[in-house]
Amino acid sequence: MKNYRIGLIPGPVRIPEEIKSAWQNDYGSSDLEEEFFTLYRENQSLTQKLLHTKNDIVITSGEAMSILWASLKCTLRPCGKLLAVSSGLFGEGFAEMAGTLGVNAEICTFPYDEVPDPQKVYDHARIFRPDVITAVHCETPSGTLTPCLAEIGRAAREFGALFVVDFVSSAGGCELDADECNIDIGLLGSQKVLSLPPCLSISSISQRAWEIIRGVKYSGYESYLGWENVPRQHFMPYTPDWHAMKALNISLNMIMREGLTSVLERHEEAAKLCRELGREMGLKLFPKSEGISSPTVTAFYVPENLTWPELDASLRAKGLAVGGNYGSLSGKVFRIGHMGSQADLELVREGMNIIRSEIMK
């Protein structure tokens, strides 16, 4: 397997040496020892600060898709109704996933290069009256950031729906106040801004959501049941990953030492530099306007004189790895990940200079 000197894919991101150190030690029995539960509680508290929430934090093993499934299976009955707010691949994915559960799922859809219109979402919810509304904060394949979570959250509250938000690739790198947005279940992955491998999934869960979860009683592997009182009852539904939990603790403390405001500014500066350099070399931004671009990832059209496989191969030959794309964007749009450890001006500048050298041959 080849290692790339300059990693700018939009997750999993480069892992800092300080975080890697968590895997250099041996730990005890994580589901029995007080030391582990103390670490778990500290990570809960630090994550609440990161997300600006008082809601419960649940930290489970596995990649973030596991909690996207959990957020649906634990809150929807087969006769339930879900409204997926979609301006991209992952927004659509919520509806597709719900459909496999026998749920009545509708999509309030918007073009991939735009963001949701909160009035259209409100009107759709008023007529449909869903049990759950889902939204995606950062559509990573599109490089867009949804600015209207608070408006959608108010609509969800008005119509009695739970509000589920995928902020896997935005939390910690973008302005986000989960409680202000009335987010009932928020979904975060470890491999983006937190700069870990894809080993942990983190959910913020409101009391409203817990009531629904207890009523639905889904008990499969991804279930939130059993996690509500983990620190108090000193019991885990399965053996947790102590190494990953320690790595998460290191990551969260690194963020807090730097300061949340400074971390957000660092992401904004890296994004701004990436787009400025892209403009200078003639790259076209995929989002319709720079104002809806995410601070954590930038999506550019592949230059017309190149194919994506050609460009990707030439960049990798120079030691640079960036992100391709999925679905209808595959081969047409590529992405620069400047999140977490990669929100670094020198790293972004070096990577963009290599892109310049290859597209301007």
Annotated model-derived regions:
Residues D179-Q191:
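Conserved active-site segment immediately N-terminal to the catalytic lysine
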